[in-house]
A protein has these predicted regions:
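Cys-dependent protein tyrosine phosphatase-like superfamily
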Residues: 1-112, 124-172
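Conserved G/P- and acidic residue-centered "switch" motifs that form tight phosphate/ATP-binding loops
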Residues: 118
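Short cysteine clusters
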Residues: 115
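Conserved SAM/SAH-binding loop-helix junction
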Residues: 121
Length: 172
């Protein structure tokens, strides 16, 4: 019997696609190829990877991007170091990637977002996408925590999101 790779669905305001919050494909006793097949079957048209290359190597997941693309899905790699807030490289890359993520969701395809465990950095990126669609920060965090209770447990993540929230609302 095939084991199921876990993911939690989240609607995005004003868009047809959903966010699929998930641990790293291949890290939950489900082979990576099977996990990706399951995410694709659930409607994923893209995968946003938030793990660093070093983390991917430690997990034996360096081929993740190639496998995602081989399945016909889009792969977006925006690494954030574990237990840290996004750095300048993320901040610089985000404006170029965000429109592509939203376009995918606008087309009704789902976006799988993952870090290693599928909570911390995953919740951060999901909240940012929800906030760019007009959802208030606290509401976005509440929706994500309902699915991933360990999201936003790090002060650096909450502080970074507070700063982004002020920028999005023009209060900064």
């Amino acid at each position: 019997m095939l084991s199921a790779h876990p993911f939690w669905s989240l609607d995005v305001p004003r868009l047809d696609g959903q966010l699929l919050l998930t641990p790293c494909p291949g890290s939950q006793q489900v082979p990576m190829a099977d996990a990706l097949a399951q995410l694709q079957l659930a409607g994923a048209g893209g995968v946003l990877t938030l793990m660093t290359e070093e983390e991917l190597a430690l997990c034996g997941s360096l081929s993740l991007g190639q496998l995602v693309q081989a399945r016909g899905m889009s792969w977006f790699h925006l690494p954030i170091a574990d237990d840290e807030a996004p750095d300048a490289a993320f901040e610089q890359a985000w404006p170029g990637v965000q429109p592509r993520l939203l376009a995918l969701l606008r087309e009704g395809r789902h976006l799988a977002i993952h870090c290693h465990g599928g909570s911390g950095r995953t919740g951060l990126a999901a909240a940012l996408l929800l906030m760019t669609q007009g959802l208030p920060q606290q509401e976005a965090m509440t929706l994500i925590r309902a699915r991933r209770p360990r999201a936003f447990t790090l002060a650096c993540h909450r502080h970074w999101l507070d700063t982004r929230g002020r920028r999005l609302t023009g209060a900064d």
